[in-house]
Each structure stands twice: as structure tokens, then as C-alpha cells.
Amino acid sequence: MLDLKKFLATPNDFEVLVKCLKKRDINRQHLIFIQKKWETSRQLKKKIEQLRKTRNQLEGPQNAEKVRVVKSEIATLEKELNGLNQELDNLVKELPNLPAPDTPFENRIVAKTEYTPLFQPQLTHEKILRKLVLIDEEKSILLSGSKFIVYQDLGSQLLHTLINFMRSENSRRGYRLFDLPYLVNDYNLYHTGQLPKFKEDSYQLNNHNFYLIPTAEVSLVNLYQKQILSEKDLPLNLCAYSPCFRAEAGAAGQENKGLIRLHQFHKVELVKIVEPENSYSELEKLVQDARNLLHLLKISHRVVELGEKELGFSATKTFDIEVWLPVSQRWLEISSCSNCEDFQSRRAQIRVKKREGDKYLPHTLNGSALAIDRLILTLCEYYYNQKENRLEIPEVLKKYFF
């Protein structure tokens, strides 16, 4: 959530807000509408305070009728103010985070690493998945419909091997491991920015206030909601595996087949809660932690800094990591690493207490390390031995393979 007081206090501050949110397709007139609501709210508060002072100055039975009139006026204005503040709160909830000042207009490649596949690639991952019977798409449809997947035999082994590999490597790099609920209350999704804007993309239980998580980021950030943390405990580095659930329609055609775009998918997520002055150096570390896994697996990849209009709702800066599929001849996003600054901590009421006693909002960061279903199809194009019709297990995974 944005701090409106910071941006509506002066005309210059308001122009900064207009300029930044124009990059996120929020028009000036909408912000002027919000500004007028905020100013009306501010004036109502002043009027109520003045009436309270007047009431306190009226003493004695001779002023009883005047006190009654003032109390009635205060009650009327307070009701008006509460309704206005609720309307204002709903409007502010819809505003996305501001892009970092150095965010590019369009996506730009900032790093790239190339590796040679173990075997000369010939078959696409779709053909390899079916040839090795790693998944059963027909049974997936029988169970749940399209965009769900059944892993079986080697496919199931590979899924859990990658989960254990990623958890182990991330733990080795200083992340605390968590296993968390996959159902959360609606306010948890609000804290991280999925609600109210992306309600239609979420799975909600009928007649309940529970939602299936779209990412473990939701659960990890909300472990610290409404808490005051000690500055000496920062940075917090958190890691969790979870299945993720998203109802979004996605792209049409080939994207809806196989493992690329699913309603239920698997991901290991990293979250950092850090001091504001360190958040961008921590973002660099987060990107390196995600890339570390791809280096170990010897998979070609690149890092793309997202342009202004590509940023997620809560993010102020994002780097996507894309893997190269040598047979499919395409780049595929496998991780997205974002700095949300204090957008989520303000919503979740996460604060940090300094040694001298002052409190501040920490910055939150999140990133996938990595998207597992997409990594499985990537491994197919790098490690499939067509001559012997088998998938070679990368050396770094063998100690996790069972």
C-alpha cells in the first residue's frame, strides 16, 4: 500500500505520484479524484476536532442543549468520515506500487550465461515427457480438467528430487526452511497484493474465507504480520516449497499444454525482509541465489530487468530469469525476483524497532528458486539421451535421487 500522506501533502509531491503511476497506466484524473477525497477527509477531521474542543468548553446545566446539539453534529460528521475513509481505503488498495526511478521503459537483458546440453538436442520436451511417460495428461483431465498434471514414476521422483535439491541449496546459502499451510485467510492475500486486484485469478473455498495460495510468498511474508521485529535480526531469509494455485486463463494454444502454464504448479520460493538501505543489494543477492541453481544444473539462462509496464502489482523493481530451451528454440521464465520496498510491510503492519527505539517499515523481497515444473521440462531438453531413450540425472542431483 502506498503512503498517501507522503504524496498528497504538497502539489509537488502529488505531481511525483502522477508521474510515477502514469507508468503503471493509472491516469491523472483518477488520482485527482482520490486527492479530493483525501482532502475532504482531512477537512472533516479538523471540523470534528474543533467541535470536540467546543463541547469540552461548554460547562454547566445552562449549556446542556448546546452540548446535545454539538454531540449530534459530531456523530453525524464521524459517520460521514468513516464512510469516506472506507471509500478512500478501497481506492488506495487498488493502486500499484511505484516503479523504482531507474526502471527501464522496456525490458532489457542484464546478464546471460550459456551451457552446452549434455546430448545433441533433437526432441522437444513435450515429446520427451510422453516418450518417457513422466506425466499422464489424460488422467489429469479425468481428475481435475485441463491445466492440471499427474506426475508418475520417474516424473514423480524427479519432482521430489528437485524440491529437496533446491531446499538444500537454499538452506546452505542462509535461508530458513519452512513448511506452511496452503490455505490462507483473505487478509493475508491483501497484505502481499493479490487482493483485491487479482481476486478472479484466485481459488476461494465456497462459503469460507480461505484461499489456496498462488505462491508461498503469501505465507512467508505473513509469518510476520502485525509484528515488531528487532533490527538485529535482519535480514530475514526465508524459503518454502509449495504447490501453487492460480485460476488465471493464461495464453491460448501451445502454452496451455504440458507443463508451461498450469492451474496447480510447484515452486520453491524465497523471501527476504531487510533494512531499507540494503534492499537493492539484497535483490542482487536474491537473483544470484536463484541463478546458482541453474549454474549447478548447467542450464543456459539470462536475466531480464522488467520495464515499467511489466512490473507486478506489488513490485518496484523486478528481474526475471529465463532459461533457454535448445530444441524448442525459446526463452522461458523460470524465476521472477522482486523488491517490493515497504509496499507489503505497510499492508501487513510489519515494523522494525531500532536500537534507539524508533520504528520503521522494512522492505520485502521475493523470488522463485525455482519454478519446478518448468525446470523439469528444461532438463528434458538438456539431459535426454535419445540413443538409449532415458533421461540422464545431472550429477548434482544424484545424491537427492531415490
List each language-model region with its residue ranges.
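N-terminal alpha-helical targeting/anchoring segments
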Residues: 1-116
